[in-house]
Amino acid sequence: MTKVGLRIDVDTLRGTREGVPRLLATLHRHGVQASFFFSVGPDNMGRHLWRLIRPRFLWKMLRSNAASLYGWDILLAGTAWPGKNIGNANAGIIRETATYHETGLHAWDHHAWQTHSGHWSIRQLEEDIARGITALEAIIGKPVTCSAAAGWRADGRVVRAKEPFNLRYNSDCRGTTLFRPLLMPGQTGTPQIPVTLPTWDEVIGPAVQAQSFNTWIISRMLQDKGTPVYTIHAEVEGIVHQPLFEDLLVRARDAGITFCPLGELLPTSPESLPLGQIVRGHIPGREGWLGCQQAASAS
Protein backbone atom coordinates (compact mmCIF):
# COMPACT_ATOMS: atom_id res chain seq x y z
CA MET A 1 0.00 0.00 0.00
CA THR A 2 1.34 3.42 -1.04
CA LYS A 3 0.39 6.35 1.20
CA VAL A 4 0.08 9.70 -0.59
CA GLY A 5 -0.57 13.03 1.12
CA LEU A 6 -3.45 14.88 -0.56
CA ARG A 7 -3.23 18.67 -0.41
CA ILE A 8 -6.11 20.80 -1.70
CA ASP A 9 -5.35 24.47 -2.39
CA VAL A 10 -8.27 26.91 -2.46
CA ASP A 11 -7.19 30.13 -4.12
CA THR A 12 -10.37 32.00 -5.07
CA LEU A 13 -13.94 32.94 -4.23
CA ARG A 14 -15.38 30.65 -6.89
CA GLY A 15 -13.10 27.80 -5.88
CA THR A 16 -14.37 28.09 -2.31
CA ARG A 17 -18.03 28.57 -3.21
CA GLU A 18 -18.34 25.96 -5.97
CA GLY A 19 -15.27 23.74 -5.92
CA VAL A 20 -14.98 22.95 -2.22
CA PRO A 21 -18.55 21.62 -1.73
CA ARG A 22 -18.11 19.32 -4.73
CA LEU A 23 -14.78 18.10 -3.44
CA LEU A 24 -16.25 17.47 0.02
CA ALA A 25 -18.99 15.35 -1.55
CA THR A 26 -16.52 13.50 -3.76
CA LEU A 27 -14.12 12.75 -0.92
CA HIS A 28 -17.02 11.60 1.29
CA ARG A 29 -18.21 9.15 -1.38
CA HIS A 30 -14.77 7.56 -1.48
CA GLY A 31 -13.97 7.72 2.23
CA VAL A 32 -10.92 9.95 1.67
CA GLN A 33 -9.62 12.67 3.96
CA ALA A 34 -7.30 15.45 2.81
CA SER A 35 -5.69 18.72 3.88
CA PHE A 36 -7.45 21.90 2.69
CA PHE A 37 -5.57 25.19 2.58
CA PHE A 38 -7.75 28.28 2.24
CA SER A 39 -7.17 31.81 1.01
CA VAL A 40 -9.40 33.87 3.30
CA GLY A 41 -8.94 37.52 2.29
CA PRO A 42 -9.70 39.43 -0.93
CA ASP A 43 -9.88 37.57 -4.24
CA ASN A 44 -7.56 39.56 -6.50
CA MET A 45 -6.40 36.65 -8.66
CA GLY A 46 -7.39 38.41 -11.89
CA ARG A 47 -4.51 40.81 -11.37
CA HIS A 48 -2.19 38.06 -12.57
CA LEU A 49 -3.34 38.82 -16.14
CA TRP A 50 -0.51 41.34 -16.60
CA ARG A 51 1.86 38.37 -16.47
CA LEU A 52 0.62 37.38 -19.94
CA ILE A 53 3.43 39.53 -21.30
CA ARG A 54 5.83 36.90 -19.96
CA PRO A 55 6.27 34.13 -22.56
CA ARG A 56 6.37 31.26 -20.03
CA PHE A 57 3.18 32.38 -18.28
CA LEU A 58 1.40 33.00 -21.60
CA TRP A 59 2.39 29.52 -22.81
CA LYS A 60 1.12 27.97 -19.58
CA MET A 61 -2.24 29.76 -19.93
CA LEU A 62 -2.58 28.64 -23.55
CA ARG A 63 -1.38 25.09 -22.85
CA SER A 64 -3.87 24.56 -20.01
CA ASN A 65 -6.71 26.40 -21.83
CA ALA A 66 -7.03 28.64 -18.78
CA ALA A 67 -10.24 30.43 -19.80
CA SER A 68 -12.24 27.19 -19.81
CA LEU A 69 -10.23 25.66 -16.97
CA TYR A 70 -10.72 28.48 -14.45
CA GLY A 71 -13.57 30.58 -15.87
CA TRP A 72 -13.55 34.29 -16.63
CA ASP A 73 -14.84 35.25 -13.17
CA ILE A 74 -11.62 33.87 -11.68
CA LEU A 75 -9.38 35.30 -14.39
CA LEU A 76 -10.84 38.80 -13.95
CA ALA A 77 -11.37 38.84 -10.16
CA GLY A 78 -10.10 42.03 -8.55
CA THR A 79 -9.20 43.77 -11.82
CA ALA A 80 -11.97 46.29 -12.54
CA TRP A 81 -13.43 46.14 -9.02
CA PRO A 82 -12.14 45.41 -5.49
CA GLY A 83 -11.75 41.71 -4.79
CA LYS A 84 -14.47 40.18 -2.61
CA ASN A 85 -13.50 38.79 0.79
CA ILE A 86 -13.41 35.00 0.40
CA GLY A 87 -13.65 34.05 4.06
CA ASN A 88 -16.54 36.35 4.91
CA ALA A 89 -18.54 35.19 1.91
CA ASN A 90 -17.94 31.47 2.48
CA ALA A 91 -17.56 31.01 6.23
CA GLY A 92 -20.08 28.17 6.36
CA ILE A 93 -18.28 26.16 3.68
CA ILE A 94 -14.91 26.64 5.37
CA ARG A 95 -16.34 25.61 8.76
CA GLU A 96 -17.88 22.48 7.25
CA THR A 97 -14.54 21.59 5.70
CA ALA A 98 -12.75 21.97 9.04
CA THR A 99 -15.27 19.59 10.63
CA TYR A 100 -14.17 16.70 8.43
CA HIS A 101 -10.71 17.54 7.08
CA GLU A 102 -7.42 19.03 8.21
CA THR A 103 -7.69 22.75 7.46
CA GLY A 104 -4.90 25.31 7.24
CA LEU A 105 -3.96 28.71 5.87
CA HIS A 106 -3.01 29.19 2.25
CA ALA A 107 -2.93 32.99 2.22
CA TRP A 108 -4.69 36.15 3.26
CA ASP A 109 -4.43 37.59 -0.27
CA HIS A 110 -3.14 34.91 -2.67
CA HIS A 111 -2.25 37.40 -5.40
CA ALA A 112 -0.39 39.71 -3.01
CA TRP A 113 1.62 36.85 -1.51
CA GLN A 114 2.54 35.38 -4.88
CA THR A 115 3.46 38.78 -6.30
CA HIS A 116 5.08 40.63 -3.40
CA SER A 117 6.18 38.24 -0.64
CA GLY A 118 9.55 37.73 -2.30
CA HIS A 119 10.63 41.24 -1.31
CA TRP A 120 8.59 41.78 1.86
CA SER A 121 10.44 42.23 5.14
CA ILE A 122 10.15 39.63 7.90
CA ARG A 123 7.77 41.98 9.71
CA GLN A 124 5.55 42.33 6.63
CA LEU A 125 5.50 38.55 6.19
CA GLU A 126 4.58 38.02 9.84
CA GLU A 127 1.80 40.61 9.67
CA ASP A 128 0.30 39.04 6.55
CA ILE A 129 0.46 35.52 8.01
CA ALA A 130 -1.08 36.75 11.27
CA ARG A 131 -3.92 38.41 9.40
CA GLY A 132 -4.72 35.19 7.57
CA ILE A 133 -4.46 32.94 10.63
CA THR A 134 -6.61 35.29 12.72
CA ALA A 135 -9.31 35.35 10.03
CA LEU A 136 -9.28 31.57 9.55
CA GLU A 137 -9.39 30.87 13.29
CA ALA A 138 -12.37 33.20 13.65
CA ILE A 139 -14.17 31.20 10.97
CA ILE A 140 -13.42 27.65 12.12
CA GLY A 141 -13.45 28.36 15.85
CA LYS A 142 -10.22 26.54 16.66
CA PRO A 143 -6.46 27.05 16.32
CA VAL A 144 -4.85 26.83 12.90
CA THR A 145 -2.10 24.20 13.04
CA CYS A 146 -0.70 24.14 9.49
CA SER A 147 -0.10 26.33 6.45
CA ALA A 148 0.96 26.13 2.81
CA ALA A 149 2.52 29.14 1.09
CA ALA A 150 0.55 30.42 -1.90
CA GLY A 151 2.23 29.48 -5.16
CA TRP A 152 5.02 27.82 -3.16
CA ARG A 153 6.54 31.30 -2.85
CA ALA A 154 8.78 30.61 0.13
CA ASP A 155 12.42 30.83 1.17
CA GLY A 156 14.35 31.06 4.42
CA ARG A 157 12.67 34.36 5.29
CA VAL A 158 9.21 32.79 5.09
CA VAL A 159 10.35 29.86 7.24
CA ARG A 160 11.53 32.27 9.93
CA ALA A 161 8.40 34.43 9.67
CA LYS A 162 6.16 31.45 10.39
CA GLU A 163 8.00 30.32 13.52
CA PRO A 164 6.13 32.58 16.00
CA PHE A 165 2.81 30.92 15.11
CA ASN A 166 3.74 27.51 16.58
CA LEU A 167 2.28 25.52 13.71
CA ARG A 168 2.49 21.74 13.61
CA TYR A 169 3.89 21.76 10.07
CA ASN A 170 4.16 23.85 6.91
CA SER A 171 3.97 22.79 3.28
CA ASP A 172 5.78 25.67 1.61
CA CYS A 173 8.00 24.12 -1.02
CA ARG A 174 8.58 21.46 -3.66
CA GLY A 175 10.89 18.59 -2.81
CA THR A 176 11.17 14.88 -2.11
CA THR A 177 10.65 14.12 1.57
CA LEU A 178 9.76 15.64 4.94
CA PHE A 179 12.49 17.67 6.66
CA ARG A 180 13.28 20.12 9.44
CA PRO A 181 14.41 23.49 8.06
CA LEU A 182 17.68 24.70 9.53
CA LEU A 183 17.29 28.24 10.87
CA MET A 184 20.83 28.63 12.21
CA PRO A 185 23.45 26.21 13.56
CA GLY A 186 21.80 24.14 16.26
CA GLN A 187 18.30 25.56 15.69
CA THR A 188 15.60 24.05 13.48
CA GLY A 189 12.16 25.25 12.48
CA THR A 190 8.70 23.78 12.02
CA PRO A 191 8.68 20.56 9.94
CA GLN A 192 8.14 21.00 6.22
CA ILE A 193 6.05 18.61 4.11
CA PRO A 194 7.04 19.36 0.49
CA VAL A 195 4.86 18.67 -2.51
CA THR A 196 6.66 16.01 -4.54
CA LEU A 197 4.38 15.52 -7.55
CA PRO A 198 3.47 17.82 -10.47
CA THR A 199 0.08 19.53 -10.59
CA TRP A 200 -2.38 19.27 -13.48
CA ASP A 201 -1.57 22.68 -14.95
CA GLU A 202 2.19 22.03 -14.88
CA VAL A 203 2.11 19.06 -17.23
CA ILE A 204 -1.02 19.17 -19.40
CA GLY A 205 -0.12 19.91 -23.00
CA PRO A 206 1.82 18.18 -25.76
CA ALA A 207 3.62 15.80 -23.37
CA VAL A 208 0.61 14.63 -21.32
CA GLN A 209 -2.93 14.70 -22.70
CA ALA A 210 -5.93 15.24 -20.42
CA GLN A 211 -7.36 11.78 -21.07
CA SER A 212 -4.13 10.07 -20.03
CA PHE A 213 -3.27 12.29 -17.05
CA ASN A 214 -4.68 9.99 -14.36
CA THR A 215 -2.69 7.02 -15.62
CA TRP A 216 0.42 9.18 -15.81
CA ILE A 217 0.14 10.72 -12.32
CA ILE A 218 -0.66 7.38 -10.66
CA SER A 219 2.50 5.98 -12.22
CA ARG A 220 4.44 8.91 -10.76
CA MET A 221 2.91 8.30 -7.32
CA LEU A 222 3.92 4.65 -7.37
CA GLN A 223 7.45 5.51 -8.52
CA ASP A 224 7.96 8.26 -5.92
CA LYS A 225 10.94 7.24 -3.76
CA GLY A 226 10.39 9.89 -1.09
CA THR A 227 7.17 10.81 0.71
CA PRO A 228 4.58 11.35 -2.05
CA VAL A 229 2.47 14.50 -1.73
CA TYR A 230 0.01 15.54 -4.43
CA THR A 231 -1.72 18.92 -4.81
CA ILE A 232 -5.05 19.60 -6.49
CA HIS A 233 -6.91 22.90 -6.76
CA ALA A 234 -10.54 23.54 -5.89
CA GLU A 235 -10.77 25.70 -9.02
CA VAL A 236 -9.71 22.81 -11.28
CA GLU A 237 -10.41 19.38 -9.81
CA GLY A 238 -13.39 20.74 -7.87
CA ILE A 239 -15.18 22.30 -10.84
CA VAL A 240 -14.45 21.61 -14.50
CA HIS A 241 -12.34 18.48 -13.88
CA GLN A 242 -14.27 17.03 -10.95
CA PRO A 243 -15.19 13.88 -12.95
CA LEU A 244 -11.52 13.28 -13.73
CA PHE A 245 -10.59 13.68 -10.07
CA GLU A 246 -13.26 11.18 -9.06
CA ASP A 247 -11.86 8.78 -11.65
CA LEU A 248 -8.39 9.35 -10.16
CA LEU A 249 -9.64 8.32 -6.71
CA VAL A 250 -11.05 5.08 -8.11
CA ARG A 251 -7.93 4.26 -10.12
CA ALA A 252 -5.63 5.12 -7.23
CA ARG A 253 -7.53 2.82 -4.87
CA ASP A 254 -7.32 0.00 -7.40
CA ALA A 255 -3.57 0.62 -7.70
CA GLY A 256 -3.09 0.28 -3.93
CA ILE A 257 -2.78 3.99 -3.18
CA THR A 258 -4.27 5.48 0.00
CA PHE A 259 -4.69 9.25 0.21
CA CYS A 260 -4.37 10.97 3.59
CA PRO A 261 -4.10 14.43 5.18
CA LEU A 262 -0.56 15.77 5.22
CA GLY A 263 -0.48 15.76 9.01
CA GLU A 264 -0.69 11.95 9.00
CA LEU A 265 2.69 11.83 7.26
CA LEU A 266 4.50 13.33 10.25
CA PRO A 267 6.50 10.87 12.35
CA THR A 268 5.81 10.47 16.06
CA SER A 269 9.13 12.19 16.74
CA PRO A 270 9.68 15.03 14.24
CA GLU A 271 13.23 15.34 15.62
CA SER A 272 14.03 12.25 13.56
CA LEU A 273 13.46 14.12 10.29
CA PRO A 274 16.53 15.09 8.25
CA LEU A 275 17.71 18.69 8.13
CA GLY A 276 17.16 20.83 5.06
CA GLN A 277 16.49 24.33 3.83
CA ILE A 278 14.22 26.12 1.38
CA VAL A 279 15.85 28.03 -1.46
CA ARG A 280 14.44 29.76 -4.52
CA GLY A 281 14.38 27.64 -7.64
CA HIS A 282 12.39 26.75 -10.75
CA ILE A 283 10.52 23.68 -11.96
CA PRO A 284 9.20 22.76 -15.42
CA GLY A 285 5.70 23.98 -16.19
CA ARG A 286 5.55 26.75 -13.58
CA GLU A 287 6.38 30.38 -14.31
CA GLY A 288 8.56 32.26 -11.85
CA TRP A 289 10.50 31.16 -8.79
CA LEU A 290 9.25 28.95 -6.00
CA GLY A 291 10.59 27.37 -2.85
CA CYS A 292 12.61 24.19 -3.39
CA GLN A 293 14.00 21.75 -0.83
CA GLN A 294 17.76 21.61 -0.53
CA ALA A 295 20.08 19.67 1.75
CA ALA A 296 21.15 21.70 4.78
CA SER A 297 24.82 21.19 3.98
CA ALA A 298 24.47 22.64 0.48
CA SER A 299 25.66 26.19 -0.09
UniProtKB/Swiss-Prot annotation:
Domain NodB homology: 2-260
Keyword annotations: Antibiotic resistance, Hydrolase, Lipid A biosynthesis, Lipid biosynthesis, Lipid metabolism, Lipopolysaccharide biosynthesis
Biological process annotations from GO: 4-amino-4-deoxy-alpha-L-arabinopyranosyl undecaprenyl phosphate biosynthetic process; lipid A biosynthetic process; lipopolysaccharide biosynthetic process; response to antibiotic
Assigned GO CC terms: membrane
EC nos: 3.5.1.n3
Domain of life: Bacteria
NCBIfam families: PRK15394.1
Protein name: Probable 4-deoxy-4-formamido-L-arabinose-phosphoundecaprenol deformylase ArnD
Species: Salmonella dublin (strain CT_02021853)
Taxonomic lineage of the native organism: Bacteria, Pseudomonadati, Pseudomonadota, Gammaproteobacteria, Enterobacterales
